[in-house]
């Protein structure tokens, strides 16, 4: 910034010296001081002062002789440097004093104020009950407070009853910003206050927030009424801020010109003692409604509707007229939808959407049309439902052409026979094309009554010449349609050989609320053409109404193939409902009243009909003849495909179903839509895959000649030894990874004879490097398969020579035999064996033979498969030509069956043991190798931890011994999580102890390791609150105390807060006559505080032996005795105590309950406790993320050797936990009452 100022000021200070020096350089310093003290964008002035001082050191003197020129130069420099056109420097030699701002209105008398207000504020009520308020200068807060009642009674009340308001600010260029909240508040609802602006004043360096007023004199203008603000290029300052705020609030529509982009407060200040003055904006709007960005200052307020200022009022009144009509338009639209719209199920959604739409931005009929259509289309998805603008005479209420009416007047049928024959000849063009192909063109659909009258003539002149043709082309390219009443009659002529009437289509008419099924006519003049011969309809973009209905139905019924252009998409079955009438025009709704539903249950929404073969209209006839030639062979192609399936597909029962489906669809005309071999292949493939659920079934078109798969290929040329070495190195990638981990990648499966031929070289160059590794990774991620004949040989290397292993079985369709595939007794080179780990990497691109190898090894539990699921390939694929055509069918000819289950697996593909993205498969395999190498030491460590620490030494030693013998069970473990589950399950089976647990806790979850992370001790203040919430006390009826806590704490910790416990807990219950201790929800915790708690319920002397605890890690027995010294009073041994238990009472809570019951100090009431254990210890297993939680201590205080661990504490009074408290109160009350 400083560099920019140096350049600017150097420009200002340096010009060629003139004869007269107007001022000293201090003028620039004075100007800079005014900017620094008054300019409302001080952040833009950073570095200016230093730049001026630097420029002054150059001793360059500004020497312009003309002061006006100097003022212009200074203005241009300041405006360009600050990018602010509001900064202006003027030369005014006649001004002796600094110019004052406009006279302050508060210095005027009341009469003068009223006169001033009446000049600046004018109002009236315009035609249509539109309020008009013109403000040319906005008074400030003091004046509005002084004259508020006058303005309300003489101005505002006259406007309150209007239906809308025009606020005219076109001539307002001044005012005080303190008046802004008054204007905004009268137009803002009074239920909330709103922050509308923040004004920064530079001279005082203060920021003032502008909020709407919570209360105003008089009434506020209703929020339901429209407000329009008029602006012009002269609208400035405070008026701009008002227009901007109302626009951002969406409370007003701004109409007119962009405002001048001035400032809230401009001041003209003298520069030093010179005759130069600087006009500078001293205040600025921070505009919270604009999101904190740049507001209107400098750029102006852009109107919602731009128009010249002198036309703004007229435009505003037109907008208000439209907006007054909006509720009526929406209401009529909703009524029209309810009364006429044929898709009744969509009406509620449309009504709701219309009611919830925001119309605040609608300022023209075009806006309204766009908004309504967007809403209607979004909900209905019906292109026929449309709002449109109408001309002055185009908005009368009338339905469009109905379903039984013609868009043009139907010509009268002549009575003379010659005239009728001539009429038929003029409407129909009939000819027979080469190849015995009938051609029929007619350019208009007639009413059913007309056809009935002209029937004999049409039959004789049109229909009979076409009866013996093999195919029929009907030309509708020039047919704009007509009435559709004759549709069932016309369609009936194309019905098949069925005896009874056939349902053609269904219609629903909203006006009559009738759903009607339309059937073919039983009796017809003349013969039917039927649907066994090919019928081809030619269409164009001019084909409309009844003509496109006919095309749609013929295509839907499968009776015709359409060729040409997409039709017009204009239907007859709509109604026009006027929504708005005005002298200039109006709005109308086009609403569909009738819906066509074809035999598939699909409703036609009136879009253009899409032909099966899309070509230009002028090319349609030629293309139809090409399609016709193709269809002559259609039956043979479909039948041929079905026969190939039955003969070669690997799943015979599916092949029969597939062929039956093809025959059925052919008979129904489903393949008439196929217009070439490509589209037929696509349809056949979709049908075959749908019925078989086999993605490997394909029909495709190949113009070139394919080599039949049954023909043996010529033997490949035998490569030289050098070439063979090069090929092997290129095709096979090997490596020995750290840890003696072999890696083998090959991306193709060769044929068995080829593998045998190059066997010695493969063994020498590839296999010998890998056979002695500790484990092997076979990477098939990039192997699409190919020949499967070498799979048994590959598998054999990973099993022993004897006994031979059944790998899988193959069902061959050609022989209809199942062949079992076994490992080979002899292989070249050394076997890898059956004991070393094998890992196979797969991806979604791995196919056929690669899948066979992976699935076989996985099925026999010989390998761990890692990667992505495969798609499911085929061991053998046959490609067969359909007849002599360039159409081919590709299908699996063999089916792979699992050796273990006998089920076919090849279609489903291979599901990995561990599913990861293919990019992570190798690293995952390496991690598993490392993990499996750790398993023996992990089991050894786990056994030692159990033997050394389990609370029962004998059982711990037995578990350790048995665990080492289970190592083979872990041979296929794939993750530490799985290892933790298996180890935990084995330990619990061996011990019968559910508290002996194993967990896998990753590095990022160490806070969940029990017993590892110490609990943070809170401050005494926090602890005081914690105690109050953790302990629940009460004194019940008959002075029975109640104490509940749900966890035991550490003794050392509780000692630190013992005084808090006594003060806030114990003192409340110590003087009761009996006590209930609620342990029903206590989950245990440290046992170190149990002796202290028990001591409160015994006398000071003599000491009582509470229990003996055996600790396995140090192989010692510790005794728990009552304490002789306690904080606070003892409860003593005489008063009754009851302890409540439940099935969740555990750990330390059970130890406490057990001691109190065994010593006869408490009556236990409730349910048998959970049978937990003394607090266990958690141990980390080697360098893994495995942790073993081991019960290390047990109670041995009972003379009979009994304990509560694992079996729980049996209450003296067994009741459900929900009734325990009630039962305890009853027993204690009975004891107290004696």
Swiss-Prot record:
In Swiss-Prot or TrEMBL terms, this protein is called Retinol-binding protein 3
Q: Which family does it belong to?
A: Belongs to the peptidase S41A family.
Annotated region (Disordered), positions in chain: 383-417
Which keywords does UniProt give here? Extracellular matrix, Glycoprotein, Repeat, Secreted, Signal, Transport, Vitamin A
What is its biological role? Answer: IRBP shuttles 11-cis and all trans retinoids between the retinol isomerase in the pigment epithelium and the visual pigments in the photoreceptor cells of the retina.
Alphabetical list of InterPro entries matching this protein:
ClpP/crotonase-like_dom_sf (IPR029045), Tail-specific_protease (IPR005151)
Pfam families annotated for this entry? Answer: Peptidase_S41 (PF03572), Peptidase_S41_N (PF11918)
Q: Write out the tissue specificity statement of the associated record.
A: Expressed in the photosensitive tissues; retina and pineal gland.
Subcellular compartments = Secreted, Extracellular space, Extracellular matrix, Interphotoreceptor matrix
Source organism of the structure: Mus musculus
Task: Tell me the disulfide pairings in this chain.
Answer: none
């Amino acid at each position: 910034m400083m560099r920019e100022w140096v350049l600017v000021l150097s420009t200002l200070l340096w010009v060629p010296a003139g004869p007269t020096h107007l001022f000293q350089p201090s003028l620039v310093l004075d100007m800079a001081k005014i900017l620094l003290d008054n300019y409302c964008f001080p952040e833009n002035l950073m570095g200016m002062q230093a730049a001026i001082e630097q420029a002054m050191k150059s001793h360059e003197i500004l020497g312009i002789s003309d002061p006006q020129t100097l003022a212009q130069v200074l203005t241009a420099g300041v405006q360009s440097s600050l990018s602010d056109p509001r900064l202006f420097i003027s030369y005014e030699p006649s001004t002796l004093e600094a110019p004052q701002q406009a006279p302050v209105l508060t210095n005027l008398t009341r009469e003068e104020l009223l006169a001033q207000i009446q000049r600046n504020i004018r109002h009236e009520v315009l035609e249509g009950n539109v309020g008009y308020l013109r403000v040319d200068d906005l008074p400030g807060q003091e004046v509005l407070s002084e004259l508020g009642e006058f303005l309300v009674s003489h101005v505002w009340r006259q406007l309150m009853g209007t239906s809308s308001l025009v606020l005219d600010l076109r001539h307002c260029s001044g005012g005080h910003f303190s008046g802004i909240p008054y204007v905004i508040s009268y137009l803002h609802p009074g239920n909330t206050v709103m922050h509308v602006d923040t004004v920064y004043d530079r001279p005082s360096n203060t920021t003032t927030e502008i909020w709407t007023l919570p209360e105003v004199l008089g009434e506020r203008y209703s929020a339901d009424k429209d407000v329009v603000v008029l602006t012009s290029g002269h609208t400035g300052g405070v008026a701009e801020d008002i227009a901007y705020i109302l626009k951002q609030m969406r409370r007003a529509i701004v109409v007119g010109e962009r405002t001048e982009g001035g400032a809230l407060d401009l001041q003209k200040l003298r520069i030093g003692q010179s005759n130069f003055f600087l006009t500078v904006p001293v205040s600025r709007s921070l505009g919270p409604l604009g999101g904190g960005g740049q507001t209107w200052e400098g750029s102006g307020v852009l109107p919602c509707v731009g128009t010249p200022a002198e036309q703004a009022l007229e435009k505003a009144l037109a907008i208000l007229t439209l907006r007054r009509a909006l509720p009526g338009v929406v209401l009529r639209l909703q009524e029209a939808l309810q009364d006429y719209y044929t898709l009744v199920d969509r009406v509620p959604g449309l009504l709701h959407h219309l009611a919830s739409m925001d119309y605040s931005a609608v300022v023209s009929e075009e806006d309204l049309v766009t908004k309504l259509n967007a809403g209607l289309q979004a909900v209905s998805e019906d292109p026929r439902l449309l709002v449109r603008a109408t001309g002055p005479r185009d908005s009368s209420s009338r339905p469009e052409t109905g379903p039984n009416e013609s868009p043009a007047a139907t010509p009268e049928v002549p009575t003379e026979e010659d005239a009728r024959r001539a009429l038929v000849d003029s409407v129909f063009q009939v000819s027979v094309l080469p190849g015995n192909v009938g051609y029929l063109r007619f350019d208009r659909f007639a009413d059913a009554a007309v056809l009935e009258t002209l029937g004999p003539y049409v039959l004789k002149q049109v229909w009979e010449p076409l009866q013996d043709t093999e195919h029929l082309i009907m030309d509708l390219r020039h047919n704009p349609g007509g009435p559709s009443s004759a549709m069932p009659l016309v369609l009936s002529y194309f019905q098949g050989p069925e005896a009874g009437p056939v349902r053609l289509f269904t219609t629903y008419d909203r006006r009559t609320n009738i759903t009607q099924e339309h059937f073919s006519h039983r009796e017809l003049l003349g013969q039917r053409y039927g649907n066994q011969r090919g019928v081809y309809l030619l269409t164009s973009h001019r084909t409309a109404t009844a003509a496109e209905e006919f095309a749609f139905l013929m295509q839907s019924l499968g009776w015709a193939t359409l060729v040409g252009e997409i039709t017009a998409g204009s239907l007859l079955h709509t109604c026009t409902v006027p929504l708005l009438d005005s002298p200039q025009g109006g709005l109308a709704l086009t609403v569909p009243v009738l819906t066509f539903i074809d035999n598939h249950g699909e409703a036609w929404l009136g879009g253009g009909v899409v032909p099966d073969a899309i070509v230009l209209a002028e090319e349609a006839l030629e293309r139809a003849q090409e399609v016709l030639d193709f269809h002559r062979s259609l039956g043979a192609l479909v039948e041929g495909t079905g026969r190939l399936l039955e003969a070669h597909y690997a799943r015979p029962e599916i092949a029969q179903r597939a062929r039956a489906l093809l025959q059925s669809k052919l008979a129904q005309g489903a393949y008439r839509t196929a217009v070439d071999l490509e589209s037929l292949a696509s349809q056949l493939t979709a049908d075959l895959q749908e019925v078989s659920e086999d993605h490997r079934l394909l029909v495709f078109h190949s113009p070139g000649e394919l080599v039949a798969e049954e023909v043996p290929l010529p033997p490949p040329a035998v490569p030289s030894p050098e070439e063979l070495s090069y090929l092997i190195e290129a095709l096979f990638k090997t490596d020995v990874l750290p840890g003696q981990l072999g890696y083998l990648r090959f991306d193709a499966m060769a044929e068995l004879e080829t593998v045998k031929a190059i066997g010695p070289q493969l063994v020498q160059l590839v296999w010998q490097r890998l056979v002695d590794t500790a484990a092997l990774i076979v990477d098939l991620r990039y192997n699409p398969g190919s020949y499967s004949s070498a799979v048994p040989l590959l598998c054999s290397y990973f099993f022993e020579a004897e006994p031979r292993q059944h790998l899988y079985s193959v069902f061959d369709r050609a022989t209809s035999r199942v062949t079992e595939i076994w490992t080979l007794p002899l292989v070249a080179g050394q076997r890898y064996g059956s004991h070393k780990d094998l890992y196979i990497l797969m991806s979604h691109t791995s196919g056929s033979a690669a899948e066979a190898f992976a699935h076989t090894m996985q099925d026999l539990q010989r390998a761990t498969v890692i990667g992505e699921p495969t798609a499911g390939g085929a061991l053998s694929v046959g490609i067969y030509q359909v007849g002599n055509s360039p159409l081919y069918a590709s299908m699996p000819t063999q089916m792979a069956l699992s050796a273990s289950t006998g089920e076919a697996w090849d279609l489903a593909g291979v599901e990995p043991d561990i599913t990861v993205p293919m990019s992570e498969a190798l690293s995952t395999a390496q991690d598993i190798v490392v993990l499996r190498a750790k398993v023996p030491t992990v089991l050894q460590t786990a056994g030692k931890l159990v033997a050394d620490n389990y609370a029962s030494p004998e059982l711990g030693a037995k578990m350790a011994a048995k665990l080492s013998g289970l190592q083979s069970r872990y041979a296929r473990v794939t993750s530490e999580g799985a290892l933790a589950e298996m180890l935990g399950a084995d330990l619990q089976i061996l011990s019968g102890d559910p508290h002996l647990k194993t967990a896998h806790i990753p590095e990022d979850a160490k806070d969940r390791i029990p017993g590892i992370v110490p609990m943070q001790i809170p401050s005494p203040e926090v602890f005081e609150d914690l105690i109050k919430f953790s302990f629940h006390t009460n004194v019940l009826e008959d002075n029975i105390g109640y104490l509940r806590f749900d966890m035991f704490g550490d003794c050392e910790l509780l000692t630190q807060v013992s005084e808090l416990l006594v003060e806030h807990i114990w003192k409340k219950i110590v003087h009761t006559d009996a006590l209930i201790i609620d342990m029903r929800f206590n989950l245990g915790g440290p046992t170190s505080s149990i002796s202290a708690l028990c001591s409160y319920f015994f006398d000071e002397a003599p000491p009582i032996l509470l229990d003996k605890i055996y600790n396995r890690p140090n192989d010692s027995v510790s005794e728990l005795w009552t304490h002789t010294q306690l904080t606070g009073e003892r409860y003593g041994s005489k008063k009754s105590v009851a302890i409540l238990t439940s099935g969740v009472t555990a750990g330390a809570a059970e130890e406490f309950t057990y001691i109190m019951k065994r010593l006869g100090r408490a009556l236990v009431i409730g349910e048998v406790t959970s049978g937990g254990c003394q607090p266990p210890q958690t141990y980390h297993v080697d360098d893994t993320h495995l942790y073993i939680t081991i019960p290390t201590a047990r109670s041995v205080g009972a003379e009979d050797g009994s304990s509560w661990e694992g079996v729980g504490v049996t209450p003296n009074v067994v009741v459900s936990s929900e009734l325990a408290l009630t039962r305890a109160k009853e027993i204690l009350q009975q004891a107290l009452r004696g």
